[in-house]
């Protein structure tokens, strides 16, 4: 008689639950080890208890290498599919932008007066209305720019006038101050008293002749000597 089907549900008894966890955990780790040895398979087993304790087994030397390989196998196909889908979306977006660029280039040629032969009367009238509207906008913008420039020039003119008035006021103030200083100096010069005549002492000449210490005889009392000491007359008397 075969074994009946066992209903799987949470074990309510805490001790029984811990015992069952230990037995099943050890059995699972043993099966993983046997599978890696018997079948030469790369096996990685990770178990967390209800308390958060970690139990693990890895048939290779590095659990990280096995997990990285698992990540490449599991998510590589998804990334490839997503990349292919993104490429398709990018190509469709490129085609839309390309068509829009061609339309804009053709419209630009029509505005410049090129390739008008393929346009009918209705298209030409529409193009004319577009050009008229563009001209009105251009003229309006040009007028606004001129008004702005005029306003700027008026402001600069007003600023220069203010500077000119300020400089003129300063110049007048400096002139008045200089005039006052010069006037005060002239008044002080006129009010200064003249020098009295007694300041200069006249030189007094002494008319009394100082008598010479040598007694000089008058000229008419001197008798000319016609002979020298030797008694010989000079040559001019001969």
UniProtKB/Swiss-Prot annotation:
Q: Which domain of life does this protein belong to?
A: Eukaryota
* Record's protein name: MADS-box protein 04g005320
Q: Which UniProt keywords apply?
A: DNA-binding, Nucleus, Transcription, Transcription regulation
Which SMART domains does UniProt cross-reference here?
MADS
Q: Major place of localization?
A: nucleus
Q: Which residues form the K-box domain?
A: 87-177
Single GO molecular-function term?
DNA-binding transcription factor activity, RNA polymerase II-specific
Q: What is any one GO biological process for this UniProt entry?
A: regulation of transcription by RNA polymerase II
- What is the annotated role of this protein in its UniProt record? Probable MADS-box transcription factor that functions with J2 and EJ2 in meristem maturation.
Domain MADS-box, first and last residues per copy: 1-61
Among its keywords, does the record have Transcription? yes
